[in-house]
Amino acid sequence: MADGSGWQPPRPCEAYRAEWKLCRSARHFLHHYYVHGERPACEQWQRDLASCRDWEERRNAEAQQSLCESERARVRAARKHILVWAPRQSPPPDWHLPLPQEKDE
């Protein structure tokens, strides 16, 4: 990764442009504001797009490092949400019994 030969950005530059464009759309703004109560932060997508283009045009090592760090941060953010339910190893022992509302009838 130090010399950058053969290295490709994690996503094509067009993907960064599409994400930035989506982030700036009115529909995404309204959805994000409704769900999170704040404006969506689109600056990172714009920085990633600029870094990707800088890498493709000049093979800039700083742009490469910026893209790598940004993608790592995205992966960490996606992994930080834990499971709500613990996976079961086996079904409950009374799984075959009728449900409580079926007993009343």
From Swiss-Prot:
One GO BP annotation of this record: negative regulation of long-term synaptic potentiation
Main location: other
Key words, A-Z: Secreted, Synapse
Signal peptide segment: none
The UniProt record lists the keyword Transmembrane helix: no
InterPro entries hit by this protein: Pants/Emi1-like (IPR021475)
GO cellular component: mitochondrion; synapse; synaptic cleft
Post-translational modification: Rapidly degraded by proteolysis following neuronal stimulation, resulting in increased AMPA receptor clustering.
Homology family: Belongs to the UPF0545 family.
Subunit structure: Interacts with RTN4 isoform A/Nogo-A; the interaction results in enhanced RTN4-mediated inhibition of AMPA receptor clustering. Also interacts with NCAM1, RANBP2 and CCT8.
Protein name: Synaptic plasticity regulator PANTS
Origin species: Homo sapiens
Lineage, opening ranks: Eukaryota, Metazoa, Chordata, Craniata, Vertebrata
